[in-house]
Amino acid sequence: MKTTILILLILGLGINAKSLEERKSEEEKAFKLLGRIIHHVGNFVYGFSHVFGDDQQDNGKFYGHYAEDNGKHWYDTGDQ
């Protein structure tokens, strides 16, 4: 009787361990998807900020060019 209970207990723990592994893999897939979404949103924000001249390193500067310039330079935001 004790042996039967022990065997059933071991089998039950094995089934629970398998379901935990399956849940873990589903969670990993969800976290990977969430990571990809965050990465793409970050890329969008980065590109959006550069299109409109915002600099992440120095918020007091504007990256652009005036008509008389033949290249892009850093200007103070007061010069615009």
UniProtKB/Swiss-Prot annotation:
CC terms in the record's Gene Ontology section: extracellular region
Signal peptide extent: 1-19
A Pfam family assignment: Clavanin
Propeptide stretches in the record: 20-29, 54-80
Principal cellular location given in the protein's record: secreted
Gene Ontology annotations of biological process type: defense response to bacterium
Tissue-by-tissue expression: Hemocytes and pharyngeal tissues.
Subcellular location: Secreted
Annotated coiled-coil segments of the chain: none
Keyword annotations of the record: Amidation, Antibiotic, Antimicrobial, Secreted, Signal
Residues recorded as bearing Phenylalanine amide in the entry: F52
Function according to Swiss-Prot or TrEMBL: Has antimicrobial activity against E.coli, L.monocytogenes and C.albicans.
Protein name in UniProt: Clavanin-D
Organism, scientific name: Styela clava
